[in-house]
């Protein structure tokens, strides 16, 4: 398995293989009708699924959501992965659906997430921070795949001025850059 450093290196390499315009148009899938559903591959781990969804929505290219992922459909090998959509809303994971909606809304609302440069600025253990920037607009995306809470303390002085205030677009508390370090719980 990859740690955050290996993951950051590999995702950056994938972007460098193709011309920029091609990378921005690539179809980004977590799963499809030809493979087990992602949620099944991670044994129903919804936190891993949420992180993968956030990554999919913030990585360059066009995110493609396989039907049912947004409500937590499971499915291993064929034909389980091609089960019909469960229209009975009582069977849906509404929290997961709201997560998908929030991530998609944030992506749609911020051009920088669709066409900005992709720069890993922190990768240690199972924690990763990506900088997306475009025409003076900069956004940080933090991923914590560890089981413990993370007090973010990362040097980002090369990208932001001291005193810069950050808003958490996914509903958490904001953060402030102090002495060249971003600190957030």
Whereabouts are the PLM-identified features?
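Carbohydrate-interacting/catalytic domains
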Residues: 44-49, 60-65, 69-185
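Alpha-amylase-like alpha-glycosidases and glucanotransferases acting on alpha-linked glucans and related
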Residues: 1-63, 113, 122-125
């Amino acid at each position: 398995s990859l740690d955050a450093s290996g993951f950051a290196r590999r995702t950056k390499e994938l972007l460098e293989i193709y011309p920029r315009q091609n990378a921005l148009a690539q179809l980004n899938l977590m799963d499809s009708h030809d493979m087990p559903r992602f949620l099944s591959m991670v044994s129903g781990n919804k936190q891993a699924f949420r992180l993968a969804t956030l990554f999919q929505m913030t990585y360059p290219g066009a995110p493609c959501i396989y039907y049912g992922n947004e409500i937590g459909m499971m499915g291993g090998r064929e034909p389980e992965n091609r089960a019909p959509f469960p229209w009975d809303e009582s069977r849906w994971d509404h929290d997961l659906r709201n997560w998908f909606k929030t991530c998609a809304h944030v992506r749609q609302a911020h051009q920088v997430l669709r066409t900005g440069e992709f720069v890993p600025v922190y990768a240690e253990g199972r924690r990763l921070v990506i900088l997306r920037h475009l025409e003076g607009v900069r956004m940080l995306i933090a991923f914590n795949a560890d089981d413990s809470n993370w007090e973010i303390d990362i040097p980002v002085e090369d990208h932001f001025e001291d005193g810069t205030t950050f808003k958490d677009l996914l509903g958490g508390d904001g953060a402030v850059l102090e002495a060249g370090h971003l600190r957030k719980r």
